[in-house]
Structure formats: C-alpha cells, structure tokens
Amino acid sequence: MDKIKIALQYMMPKHLISRLVGKLAAAEMGSVTTAAIKWFIKQYKIDMSEAAQSSPEAYSTFNDFFTRALKPGIRPISDKKDYIVHPVDGAVSQCGPIKHGQIFQAKGHEYSSLALLGDRADDAKRFEDGDFATIYLAPKDYHRIHMPIKGTLSKMTYVPGELFSVNPLTAENVPGLFARNERVVAIFETEIGPMAMVLVGATIVASIETIWAGTVTPPTGKKVFTWDYPTEGPAALTLDKGAEMGRFKLGSTVVMLFAKDALDDFADDVTPKAVTRMGQPFAKIED
C-alpha cells in the first residue's frame, strides 16, 4: 500500500491540485465555507478555544481560518536569554548537526544544505558544520511562523520545485524531499550568526507568505529568485524573538539552519516526533 501511495505522489499533478485548492480556500462562499471549517475542526480535533476568533462563522474564507491568530498570551515567549525558542506549533521531524554539508532526512536519506538553499554556495558555506532542525506542521496546528531569536533580514530566495506531500511516509521514501519541494529561504543576521528559515511547500499548500513580501508563492516559475535586503539603516527589517515572520496557507514544514558553534545543544525535550509549541525553549545558545 505504501508503494502505491508513493507512486501516486509521483504521478498526480501536484501543482495543479494545489492551485485549485488554493483558489477554493481563498473564495468567500458563505455557508459552504463555514461548513468546511466546521468539518475541518471536527476532523482534526482543533482546539478553537485558543483562537482569537473561536467561532467558525467569524472566518470569511478557509484561508482566514487556517491562518487564524491565537489569543494574546496563549503562547508566551520564553524569557530564557540563553535559549532560542520554537518558531511554530508542530512536531520535530529531525534535528542535529550538518555533517559534510548533509542534512539527515530519515533513515537512509540525506540531502545537501546547498540544494536546500537553492544551490547558493555562498549561503551554504555559512552553515558548514552547523546545526539544523526540521519541524512539521500538521493540519490541526497553528500555521503562523515566528522568530526563534531576534534577527535582521539579509536575504530571501524563492526556489521552485515539486509539491510532494510532507509526512513520515514521504520523508522515508522520497529522496531529498525538502530540497525538491518548492520553498522560500529567509536568511537573518543574529547575535549567534546567520540563521536560515526555510519554509517548505507541499501538496495543497495554497501559498507561502512572509510579513515583508506578502505572498511569495504562487505565482511559481522555474527560476530561482533572490532578494537582498539592507541590514543597517532605516530600511533594515529587524524582527524580535517571537515576532511573526511568515505563514503557510495549508502548510507544511520549516527547516532551520544555524552556523557552526551557534548552538550548544537542543533542549532535552527536542527529539524526533516531539510536539513543539511556539515560544517554548528550543535550543541553548553557545556561550
């Protein structure tokens, strides 16, 4: 059965399906939208008591519901100054060292940091022998992405690619999954060196957005695009620890990269399959 599921992943028109779902998710369809939201809440056991707007009727589109805000204070940002924090609600897929430019995906599968970053050798070099963490966001999760540490945006890269589903089955069977799927790479300058936040798309991910550029995907293309940003002066964009930096509309996975010697160790509860909550301690900063 698993082989059939993987074969279907290769065969189905993933981009077409994703864009059609995206159009439906953005449409205002009144009672149809409300019914879809109610079904989704029941199907995935979503705790709407955490949402700033708890009523399904409060959302005019499915996208509005999916990117719903939380009540103020529901995800407090850890005040431990020697720790970075979880950027999202989700589950840890993998975390650990970047060895010889390779990132661990699943048993028997690795991919290169160079490929993940859109074959930008100068960017990949900054993360040689550093650390990575991959966090998967399930449909039930809060889908806004926040800063693990205060940082100033220096670069954003859009990398075209596939739109395979992201789950344990595909991670174990699709080589280089996160370096094959469409993604947006944001690089920040922080007190512990460069940090990459890679927002990875997947099947039926309607769009990837950042707070500075709005919707980055779609539209899509076959070219890698890079935008450079000033890190000093009035035009520089600096985001505080815990500040929102982006969001997924029906979305997927965040891969974080850190430079060599930036992190001392991951928090004790940060292990594969561990549930994450945005704002909680994630990794200790190297002294």
Swiss-Prot record:
Domain of life: Bacteria
Disulfide bond sites: none
Primary localization: membrane
This protein's record includes keyword Membrane: yes
Post-translational modification, as annotated: Is synthesized initially as an inactive proenzyme. Formation of the active enzyme involves a self-maturation process in which the active site pyruvoyl group is generated from an internal serine residue via an autocatalytic post-translational modification. Two non-identical subunits are generated from the proenzyme in this reaction, and the pyruvate is formed at the N-terminus of the alpha chain, which is derived from the carboxyl end of the proenzyme.
Membrane-related topology note: Peripheral membrane protein
Cofactor note (record): Binds 1 pyruvoyl group covalently per subunit.
Subcellular location: Cell membrane
GO molecular function, a single term: phosphatidylserine decarboxylase activity
Enzyme type, top EC level: lyase
Site (Cleavage (non-hydrolytic)): 251-252
Location of Pyruvic acid (Ser) modifications: 252
Record's catalysed reaction(s): a 1,2-diacyl-sn-glycero-3-phospho-L-serine + H(+) = a 1,2-diacyl-sn-glycero-3-phosphoethanolamine + CO2
Pfam families in the cross-refs: PS_Dcarbxylase (PF02666)
Known pathway: Phospholipid metabolism; phosphatidylethanolamine biosynthesis; phosphatidylethanolamine from CDP-diacylglycerol: step 2/2
Active site residues according to the UniProt entry: 89 (charge relay system), 146 (charge relay system), 252 (charge relay system), 252 (schiff-base intermediate with substrate)
Gene Ontology process terms (BP): phosphatidylethanolamine biosynthetic process
Family designation: Belongs to the phosphatidylserine decarboxylase family. PSD-B subfamily. Prokaryotic type I sub-subfamily.
Function: Catalyzes the formation of phosphatidylethanolamine (PtdEtn) from phosphatidylserine (PtdSer).
Quaternary structure note: Heterodimer of a large membrane-associated beta subunit and a small pyruvoyl-containing alpha subunit.
Protein name, UniProt field: Phosphatidylserine decarboxylase proenzyme
Originating organism: Shewanella woodyi (strain ATCC 51908 / MS32)
